[in-house]
UniProtKB/Swiss-Prot annotation:
EC number assigned by the record: 6.3.2.6
Biological process (GO), any one: 'de novo' IMP biosynthetic process
Family matches, as PROSITE patterns: SAICAR_SYNTHETASE_1 (PS01057), SAICAR_SYNTHETASE_2 (PS01058)
Recorded name of the encoding gene: purC
Residues in the signal sequence: none
Organism superkingdom: Bacteria
Keyword Ligase: yes
Pathway where this protein functions: Purine metabolism; IMP biosynthesis via de novo pathway; 5-amino-1-(5-phospho-D-ribosyl)imidazole-4-carboxamide from 5-amino-1-(5-phospho-D-ribosyl)imidazole-4-carboxylate: step 1/2
Enzyme class per UniProt: ligase
Protein name, per record: Phosphoribosylaminoimidazole-succinocarboxamide synthase
Keywords tagged on the record: ATP-binding, Ligase, Nucleotide-binding, Purine biosynthesis
Reaction catalysed by this enzyme: 5-amino-1-(5-phospho-D-ribosyl)imidazole-4-carboxylate + L-aspartate + ATP = (2S)-2-[5-amino-1-(5-phospho-beta-D-ribosyl)imidazole-4-carboxamido]succinate + ADP + phosphate + 2 H(+)
Record flagged with keyword Transmembrane: no
Record-stated family: Belongs to the SAICAR synthetase family.
Length: 235
């Protein structure tokens, strides 16, 4: 397989179909824009399984994704997309950069869900942007597309909040990415995993996400395995 692209968490390979690629989840762990890095054996397989499970559930809810099927422990066959260079961050509870930026106390429940856009650019440390910035940077074609990203973000949040709640997890916040398929349709891409979500146990408040690695709070593999096992029980 010819390697087309390698990022911090995934490798993308070409297939015989020009509109499909293989996405391989790596065992690498990174935080603080790559300043902190490590490896955790089995982490790629866990994130691949979690993303497959969640994307299949989202498809049933009418939210289009790039997933075609999982083909082995760490690989998915997905639709080839042109990634939109906007990270859509959805927040239900104050945590992370929001607490730091606005001086709000971590753990505070927000009065309503906040949707933020970040410019996907490592050299600039993925800065927070507004709609005007997105248009000036030509990250989207129209403001209606920004509205669609926001709408999808809120739809994903509504579904995932209920999905995780069923297994005793609070969805604090998450990051998602989108791309354009061969027909120009905007669809959900990348992943939804404990790498890209903050998940807290409802009873204990225990973190079951990448903050464990960021701040040396516990074992990533144990936490991600627990998340996957809980999600398998969703009825």
């Amino acid at each position: 397989m010819k390697l087309l692209y390698e990022g911090k968490a995934k490798r993308i390979y070409e297939t015989q179909n020009p509109n499909e690629v293989i996405c391989e989840f790596k065992d690498s762990l990174t935080a603080f824009n790559g300043e902190k890095a490590d490896e955790e054996s089995g982490k790629g397989a866990l994130n691949c399984a979690i993303t497959t499970l969640i994307f299949e559930a989202l498809e049933k809810e009418g939210i289009p994704t790039h997933l075609i099927k999982q083909i082995d422990e760490t690989k998915q066959l997905v639709k080839k997309v042109d990634i939109i260079l906007i990270e859509v961050v959805v927040r239900n509870i104050v945590a992370g950069s929001l607490a730091k930026r606005l001086g709000l106390k971590e753990g505070t429940k927000l009065p309503f869900t906040i949707v933020e856009f970040y410019y996907k650019n490592d050299d600039l440390n993925d800065p927070l942007i507004n709609d005007d910035h997105a248009m000036v940077l030509e990250l989207v074609k129209t403001r209606k597309e920004l509205d669609l990203l926001r709408e999808y973000g809120l739809k994903v949040n509504k579904f995932l909040s209920e999905f995780f709640d069923k297994v005793g997890l609070t969805l604090v916040d998450f990051k998602i990415e989108f791309g354009r398929d061969e027909n120009g349709n905007i669809i959900l891409a990348d992943e939804i995993t404990p790498d890209s979500c903050r998940l807290w146990d409802k009873k204990t408040g225990k973190k079951l996400d990448k903050d464990l690695f960021r701040f040396n709070l516990g074992n990533i593999k144990e936490a991600y395995t627990e998340v996957l096992n809980r999600l398998k029980d969703v009825k």
